């Protein structure tokens, strides 16, 4: 159905907002009282404020904000392009894979290695695979446009494309093998994806609200 993909992403993003709030609140609680959840040790889990704060960051940035941005993009870009989303089924299905990738990142923030497997890189790899599927879906949608895409659409496309472009630049330049280069690439991507994505959505929303789409 039209809009099913966008709804799926936004609903799951809302669910991650609840978990992000729980992780962040629990982290702040443990910072105030480190022994508040010591009873969980009998279940084999030792709650740690820093680890829960990391889980809150992953759930907020990748689970909530990223899913909201991508979900909104599945609504905005087809509207601006004067066409339908290339594949609602693809948009719907990959949202669940993205949720799994965020879950892997959250688990990795608590235990980075399980059975000798590094969890965080696995979650990041899964995350990037889903992002490539999202980008392909949006590019196919743009290819079928019936009118010129306004600025909000281009801002959102720039946000989505920033990850693979920066990954290629990092590999070609050799920055991927350097700790400083990895840090810089990560923060440039974060700035581009979140800023351009939110800016595009805000510009579209303000244009619609003012009656000047």
Feature locations, PLM:
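Hydrophobic alpha-helical transmembrane segments of multi-pass integral membrane proteins
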Residues: 1-213
């Amino acid at each position: 159905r039209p809009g099913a993909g966008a709804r799926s992403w936004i609903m799951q993003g809302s669910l991650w907002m609840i978990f992000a709030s729980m992780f962040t609140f629990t982290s702040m609680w443990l910072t105030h009282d480190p022994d508040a959840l010591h009873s969980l040790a009998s279940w084999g889990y030792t709650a740690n404020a820093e680890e829960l704060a990391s889980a809150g960051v992953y759930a907020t940035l990748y689970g909530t904000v990223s899913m909201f941005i991508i979900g909104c993009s599945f609504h905005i870009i087809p509207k601006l392009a004067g066409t339908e989303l290339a594949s609602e089924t693809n948009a719907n299905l990959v949202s669940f894979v993205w949720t799994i990738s965020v879950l892997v990142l959250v688990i990795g923030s608590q235990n980075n290695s399980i059975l000798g497997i590094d969890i965080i890189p696995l979650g990041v790899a899964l995350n990037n695979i889903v992002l490539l599927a999202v980008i392909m879906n949006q590019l196919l949608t743009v290819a079928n446009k019936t009118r010129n895409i306004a600025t909000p659409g281009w801002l959102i496309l720039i946000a989505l494309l920033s990850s693979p472009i920066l990954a290629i630049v990092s590999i070609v330049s050799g920055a991927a093998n350097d700790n400083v280069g990895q840090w810089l690439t990560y923060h440039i991507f974060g700035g581009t994806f979140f800023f351009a994505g939110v800016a595009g959505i805000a510009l579209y929303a303000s244009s619609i609200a003012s009656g000047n789409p």
